[in-house]
Regions:
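Mature N-terminal segment immediately following signal peptide/propeptide cleavage
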Residues: 19-49, 320
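A flexible loop/linker signature enriched in serine peptidases of the S9 family
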Residues: 19-21, 39-45, 53, 58-64, ...
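Residue-level detector of Asp-centered blade-edge/turn motifs that repeat once per structural unit
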Residues: 31-32, 71-72, 115-116, 168-169, ...
Length: 334
C-alpha cells in the first residue's frame, strides 16, 4: 500500500491582527509634522508622527509607492502600477478615490509638489531634448510637471533630477543628479558616478553644485527658513547619515546623526523643522538638538494565507526525522 504523506502548508489563519512593520520605504513626514506617510508591502499608509496605529490608504492589488504630501497636507501623490506601468496618482490624505494624472507608457515617479500646490513634479523617461548629449536610455530620466487636476505634462529639465525639494518661494529647488547606471542601493560606492546635491534656479535656469564629493550625497531637503540644507551622505567612511550645511557656505558640513552599521534613508522635514528618516527598517523623527526618537507603529493587516492541508503520495525528497522521533521534515513540490 502506498504511503500517504501529509504536509501542512505553511501559513497562518486568516485573521486581522496588529503587527509592528519593518523595512518601510518612501517615508515622508507631512508639512505640519503631525503625520508620516510610507510604503509597506506595496500599499500606502500614514501614521501619527508621535506613533500609533497606521491607516491604510490604498487597497489595490497593484504596487503603490513613493507617497509625497501636498503643501497644505490635504493630498498625497504616489506612483501605482495598477494600469501596467507606474503612473502618477493623487488622492485625499485622509483616504478616498485616487485620480490618475499621467498615462504615458513610461514609468512616472513623483518627486515633489510645487509650493503653490498646483503641480506635481515627477521623473520619467519620455523624450530627451533635441540638444541632449546624454545616451538615450530609460535609466536616465527627465524631470516633468503635471497639473494637480491632470492635463498636459511639461518638461522642467532634460537631465536626471531626482528627490526634488523646493524652497518656500518656489524660485529654487534642490535635487540629486544621476550620472550613470550604478545601483542606488549599493553601499560605500566611491567614484565619479556617485550622486551629488545641486540647486536649480527656476528663474535663471542656473544649476549650482553644492557637494563635490567622491562618495554618495543625496536626498537633500531645506529647513523651513531655506537657509540650511540637510542631506544624506556616506562621507567620513561610514554608512549613510544625516548631514547639514548652511546654504551660503556649502563646504561647512556638520554631522547630524551618527548611526553605525546600517544606512539612514528616506530623509524629509516638516515646517516645524522635524526631521524624519528610516534606520535599520524603522522610522525615526528628530528635532534640532534632540536625540532621534523611534516611531512606534501598529499596523492592522488581513493578508496572511489560510492554512490548508496538502495531500501527496509521491515526490517527497530530503526527508529527516526530528531528534524526538515525532516529526519529519521533508521537501515537496519545490
Amino acid at each position: 500500500m502506498k504511503k500517504l504523506l501529509t504536509c501542512i502548508a505553511l501559513g497562518f489563519a486568516t485573521t486581522s491582527y496588529a503587527v509592528t512593520p519593518l523595512w518601510m520605504r518612501d517615508v515622508q513626514i507631512s508639512p505640519d509634522g503631525t503625520e508620516i506617510a510610507f510604503c509597506y508591502k506595496g500599499d500606502i499608509y500614514k501614521v501619527p508622527a508621535k506613533g500609533g496605529t497606521a491607516t491604510q490608504l490604498t487597497t489595490q492589488a497593484s504596487y503603490e509607492c513613493t507617497p509625497i504630501w501636498s503643501p497644505d497636507g490635504k493630498q498625497i501623490a504616489f506612483a501605482s502600477d495598477r494600469n501596467g506601468n507606474f503612473d502618477l496618482f493623487v488622492m485625499p490624505s485622509n483616504g478616498g478615490t485616487a485620480q490618475c494624472l499621467t498615462t504615458h507608457s513610461a514609468s512616472e515617479i513623483p518627486s515633489a509638489f510645487t509650493p503653490d500646490g498646483k503641480y506635481v513634479l515627477f521623473s520619467a523617461s519620455i523624450q530627451d531634448p533635441a540638444q541632449s548629449a546624454l545616451f538615450p536610455t530609460s535609466a536616465m530620466t527627465e524631470l516633468y510637471k503635471v497639473p494637480i487636476g491632470g492635463g498636459r505634462t511639461e518638461q522642467v529639465l532634460g537631465t536626471p533630477a531626482e528627490m526634488v525639494c523646493f524652497d518656500k518661494s518656489g524660485k529654487t529647488f534642490l535635487y540629486q543628479d544621476r550620472k550613470g547606471f550604478e545601483d542606488e542601493w549599493r553601499k560605500h560606492h566611491t567614484s565619479s558616478v556617485t550622486r551629488d546635491i545641486w540647486m536649480y534656479d527656476t528663474q535663471t535656469g542656473k544649476h549650482t553644485n553644492l557637494t563635490d564629493h567622491a562618495g554618495e550625497d543625496r536626498n537633500a531637503v531645506f529647513t523651513p527658513d531655506g537657509q540650511t540644507v540637510y542631506f544624506l551622505s556616506e562621507r567620513n567612511g561610514g554608512s549613510f547619515n544625516v548631514y547639514s550645511f548652511p546654504l551660503n557656505t556649502p563646504q561647512s558640513i556638520t554631522a547630524v546623526t551618527k548611526f553605525k552599521t546600517h544606512p539612514v534613508r528616506f530623509l524629509s522635514t516638516s515646517s516645524d523643522n522635524t526631521l524624519c528618516y528610516t534606520y535599520d527598517g524603522e522610522i525615526y523623527t528628530q528635532r534640532p538638538g534632540v536625540n532621534p526618537q523611534k516611531v512606534r507603529i501598529d499596523l492592522i493587516r488581513d493578508d496572511q494565507e489560510q492554512i490548508s492541508d496538502l495531500n501527496s503520495s509521491k515526490g517527497a525528497t530530503s526527508a529527516t526525522v526530528s531528534p524526538d522521533g515525532k516529526q519529519i521534515a521533508l521537501t515537496l513540490r519545490g
